[in-house]
């Protein structure tokens, strides 16, 4: 089979889940995100009908309401999205055991060797789309290619409900004319650096001297050069999510946050969430990362490694605040905050504690975890969550997992 890799990308996934769950929403402009009553926050997803009005993911709810006054605004419900995603993965595994979830609404599948059972890769894609539509109730675009890179790019070429095949001979014709930002893995900062080298299209990147790219970007330059030619050697890995490298959480704020005091409230809330998930997995971690984005969504990410692994929110918070003070000026507004803990190990041993503080903290965490297990994640919160800067109580904890 020449092009055995498929990428299934659910269209307007969050909004589509709500439409699938509530038939009255079908055909209506559904907008998910923020606080519908107060008209603040950002759009996480928009249905096809809302997108037709100009609504885009990432814009403010207020902007979306102006573009689509008839829009139906809904709060996100991540538990439902996770459930739907799991159902879709189960359908994909009916065709092949080689399924790799890429995000909550995307997954790769390698159908090598499945031809005798299900037909060609295109025939499998048609059957997959039909089953997801009929059994789950959402539409998806499927990209088909010889590798994950081309399958991923193919999936984005025809939305919604598309089916596109990209093979190596298609790269010069269909891929090279595209802006370099369209190449998978190229973000805004990397795009700017490439433009400084007069690289504006993917074709420009493919034709650029490899040695210069390696001098400018190191190993990343080599990978970029390969990607621009449609080359990707990474396999579909069904076990990718089982090897937990880090656990993180991030929140897009409902407004600009100014000054350290406001930002530190959100950082503490995130540390609580992250460390709760770390403990649930039986882990402890050493490397704390803090990610911040400003109002233009230009981002900064910094990390620091501690001397010992921990699952304590207070210890992670202390390091995250140090990173904040060292790398983010107090006058600069913040619109998104993320915290993650990496360098994870199974939490079998505790650091030697001469004064019993670690043991007291461990018992406190265990007690809080038991309360949350029984009564829900937000049955007990830090007092700072009740201040104007707190976001978890109002949002019910709906934020993006890392």
From Swiss-Prot:
Pfam families: IMS, IMS_C, IMS_HHH_1. It is found in: Cytoplasm. The record marks 14 as: Substrate discrimination. SUPFAM superfamilies: DNA/RNA polymerases (SSF56672), Lesion bypass DNA polymerase (Y-family), little finger domain (SSF100879). GO terms for cellular component: cytosol. Residues 5-187 form the UmuC domain. Binds 2 magnesium ions per subunit. It is an enzyme of class 2 (transferase). This is DNA polymerase IV. It comes from Pelotomaculum thermopropionicum (strain DSM 13744 / JCM 10971 / SI).
């Amino acid at each position: 089979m020449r092009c055995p890799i498929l990428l299934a990308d659910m269209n307007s996934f969050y909004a589509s889940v709500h439409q699938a769950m509530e038939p009255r929403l079908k055909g209506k402009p559904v907008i998910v995100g923020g606080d519908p009553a107060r008209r603040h926050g950002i759009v996480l997803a928009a249905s096809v009908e809302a997108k037709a009005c100009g609504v885009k993911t990432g814009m403010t709810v207020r902007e979306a309401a102006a573009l689509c006054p008839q829009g139906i605004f809904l709060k996100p419900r991540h538990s439902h999205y996770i459930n739907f995603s799991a159902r879709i993965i189960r359908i994909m595994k009916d065709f092949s055991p080689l399924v790799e979830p890429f995000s909550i609404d995307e997954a790769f599948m390698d159908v090598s060797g499945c031809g005798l059972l299900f037909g060609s890769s295109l025939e499998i894609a048609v059957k997959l789309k039909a089953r997801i539509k009929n059994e789950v109730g959402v539409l998806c675009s499927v990209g088909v290619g010889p590798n994950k890179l081309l399958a991923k790019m193919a999936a984005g070429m025809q939305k919604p409900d598309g089916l596109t095949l990209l093979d190596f001979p298609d790269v010069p014709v269909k891929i090279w004319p595209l802006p370099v930002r369209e190449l998978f893995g190229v973000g805004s900062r990397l795009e700017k650096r490439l433009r400084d080298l007069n690289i504006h299209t993917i074709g420009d990147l493919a034709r650029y001297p490899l040695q210069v790219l390696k001098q400018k970007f190191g190993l990343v330059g080599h990978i970029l050069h390969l990607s621009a030619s449609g080359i990707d050697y990474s396999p579909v890995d069904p076990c990718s999510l089982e090897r937990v490298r880090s656990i993180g959480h991030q929140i897009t704020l409902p407004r600009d946050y100014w000054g350290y005091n406001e930002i530190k409230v959100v950082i503490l809330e995130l540390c609580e969430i992250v460390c709760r998930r770390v403990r649930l997995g039986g882990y402890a971690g050493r490397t704390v990362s803090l990610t911040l984005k400003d109002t233009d969504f230009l981002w900064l990410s910094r990390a620091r490694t501690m001397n010992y692994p921990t699952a304590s929110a207070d210890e992670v918070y202390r390091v995250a605040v140090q990173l904040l003070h060292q790398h983010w000026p107090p006058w600069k507004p913040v619109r998104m905050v993320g915290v993650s803990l990496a360098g994870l190990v199974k939490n079998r041993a505790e650091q030697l504690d001469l004064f019993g503080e670690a043991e007291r903290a461990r018992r406190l965490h265990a007690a809080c975890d038991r309360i949350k297990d029984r009564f829900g994640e937000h049955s007990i919160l830090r007092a700072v969550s009740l201040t104007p800067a707190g976001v978890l109580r109002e949002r019910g904890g709906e934020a993006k997992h890392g």
